[in-house]
Amino acid sequence: MKTFVKIMTLVVLLSLIVGCAPAPAATEAPVAATQAPVAVATEAPVVPAAPVLSEAEQWAKDNGVGPYQPATDDWAAIEAAAIQEGKITIYANSGGIEDLADAWKAKYPDIEWEGADTDGIDTKMAAEQESGNVVGDVWFNSDGHILFGRFVPNQWLWSFVPRDVVIPELTAERPFAVARHSTDVIGYNNKFYPNGCPVTNIWQLTEPVYKGKFFMEDPMSDVSTMAKIATFVQNADEMAQAYQALYGKAWDTDELAKTDASGIVVENAGYLWLKKLAYNGVVVLDDGDMVDAAFAGLELPEGEEPGFGWTGYSTYEATLDGELNMSPCFGMEPVMGIFKTSFLAIANKAPHPNAAKLFIRFALTEEGFDPWNEIGSYPAAEGLPVFEGNLPLAELLPQVWEMDPVFDWNNVSKVRDFWAASLLVAP
């Protein structure tokens, strides 16, 4: 009996143990098949939006000028459109433009001509652009510093160079057609000095012996002349070398190189030369004819030192005709003159854009260059004749400095202030 009880007790305990054990975890049935990958739609390549053109750029594009000029010029279509426009207006800073009128009228009788030597071209054209009342079609002007410094950034002028004309000096940065180069020189009176220019170094013009004997157009009233004298500042290193060669010492040892009580700071040898000119009684006059008469006129007193003048090389032609006694100071160190550039451009929103194209092409032909084919002027376009009496360019260029329109624009105001202050405090 006791044995039976023990057995039953053991059975009950085992039942309790089994009942308290956790049930085995259920396992999930294996997935029968994997899902197919979802296809992702690919986008079409993004096409860049066309650049938004300014109003001026749109006009240039519509009229095929500037960077929108076609690869070829359809001159038959251009001439037909120009005849429909019926007129051309040119603003030029040279009297030679008036000598071109007859040739134009003979070639294009159906296109009315309006072109004259115009003062203040930059002021006039800027006012037209700002007002929106554009009258002038063509800029024919040598004030390159204003062209590149003011008009180009404002999109007031556009380039146009006929595709059949080659002007080697053009670049992407300077794309405007070049009508010609001309030369300003330091001249002397060849009657008073029949054996040649009495000075060989430009610094001699600032010495007391020539006090009040250097004549030039007034830079304060002539923007072109102010840009020209900025060229001496740009080439200060060569001015310093010329000073050293003449005086045997550095330019900054000069008494006038020091900052004086007026506070004028002389930054380089170019500025020093301008200051010394002012202190030596430079004579500024209203125009080039007055300059020529002052030192090379036929009526100057006998035996009196006539001095020197900053004048056009073309003035020498008047000497050959017996009207003046001027010769350039060839061989002067470091230079005897300045090499200038006359640019052609089409006004933004010009009322006669096709006539303007026609004129630029005409101006770059032998017939169009003829009024300026004279001593001191050199064509820029290939194939045009050079005046027979001109000094060959290979001989001229080492004796002159070419004006840099970008430098001039960036520095002309500073040079103007320096020049004005020097004149003001000069004894």
PLM feature segments, named:
Residues 337-406:
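Mature extracytoplasmic/periplasmic domains
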Residues 167-170, 181-184, 273-277, 322-348:
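Periplasmic-binding protein-like
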Residues 48-71, 399-427:
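Conserved C-terminal helix/tail region of periplasmic/extracytoplasmic solute-binding proteins
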